[in-house]
């Protein structure tokens, strides 16, 4: 029924904790899952493959595929690799700096089942990228997984299957239907680190699918986990890490402009969902001239090791 994609670039501790929370949640729901674990060229001393192998040993009754990229793929690459190897009808992608709960999985599966047009379903969190309207912060700091689980359950109890539609995709933890993947393929690999999800959301909209947020689904998000890890290990200041990130965002935006023939803005100013909404409105007239499906290029398999 469910394929679960978890990418990791370094930080085995975060990764193992994330995988443990997923395994606990799906086991409580008696779900048989296919795990697709993608090592994004992590340093050998980070022991990501060891964390993945330990998960395979723990995940009795589930199928686990382990894929390692020899080169850094970043967001669009690891997501697309995961989609290439996922085979189930429903696919869940999650960043490795998150903790999920049984209530979260229940909620996104429930909302996804409400309509065949719901191509992508996300949830809420204590920390959300580009979607401040989906941020739900606990009144007090949650110190244990039991407290996280209890808070998530309270959000589910209060909101059940309530949902709202989104115009822009920020894809840190999302559920996708196989029908969507068959229609628009994987993420466009011209977008290395950023704008891959925005482009994918645009293509989903243009293909007739809806992006929705399950308001009863809540997970814990550490936020920028791999960035914080690399800052610590590469002795980068916050300003240096921010400038490096924004340079990558600008490069990706210029690719987005080129793909969708956008004259303005000439420079991405760091914006967010508001600008992305404007992009969607402006690219809609180009839908008939633009291929919506992007297939995983066979040549990309050359960079991968399968375990």
Where are these regions (language model features)?
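Active-site-adjacent helix/loop segment of glycosyltransferases
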Residues: 129, 202, 206-307
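A conserved hydrophobic helix/loop-capping motif in glycosyltransferases and polysaccharide synthases
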Residues: 2-18, 25, 38, 111
């Amino acid at each position: 029924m469910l394929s679960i994609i978890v990418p990791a670039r370094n930080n085995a501790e975060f990764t193992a904790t994330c995988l443990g929370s997923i395994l606990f949640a799906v086991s409580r729901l008696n779900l048989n899952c296919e795990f697709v674990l993608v090592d994004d060229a992590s340093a050998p001393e980070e022991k990501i493959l060891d964390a993945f192998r330990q998960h395979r040993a723990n995940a009795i009754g589930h199928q686990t595929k382990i894929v390692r990229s020899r080169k850094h793929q970043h967001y669009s690459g690891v997501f697309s690799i995961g989609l290439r190897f996922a085979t189930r009808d429903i696919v869940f992608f999650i960043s490795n700096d998150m903790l999920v709960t049984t209530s979260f999985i229940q909620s996104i599966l429930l909302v996804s089942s409400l309509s065949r047009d719901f191509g992508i379903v996300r949830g809420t969190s204590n920390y959300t990228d580009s979607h401040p309207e989906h941020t739900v912060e606990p009144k007090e700091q949650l110190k244990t997984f039991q407290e996280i689980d209890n808070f998530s359950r309270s959000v589910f109890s209060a909101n059940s299957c309530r949902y709202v539609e989104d115009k822009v995709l920020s894809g840190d933890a999302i559920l996708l239907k196989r029908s969507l993947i068959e229609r628009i393929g994987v993420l466009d690999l011209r977008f290395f680190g950023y704008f891959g999800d925005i482009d994918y959301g645009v293509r989903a909209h243009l293909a007739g699918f809806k992006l929705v947020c399950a308001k009863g689904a809540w997970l814990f998000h550490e936020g920028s986990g791999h960035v914080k890890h690399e800052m610590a290990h590469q002795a980068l200041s916050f300003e240096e890490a921010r400038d490096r990130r924004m340079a990558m965002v600008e490069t990706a935006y210029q690719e987005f402009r080129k793909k969708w023939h956008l004259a303005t803005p000439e420079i991405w100013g760091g914006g967010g969902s508001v600008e992305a909404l404007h992009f969607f409105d402006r690219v809609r007239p180009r839908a008939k001239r633009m291929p919506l499906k992007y297939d995983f290029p066979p040549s990309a398999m050359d960079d991968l090791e399968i375990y």
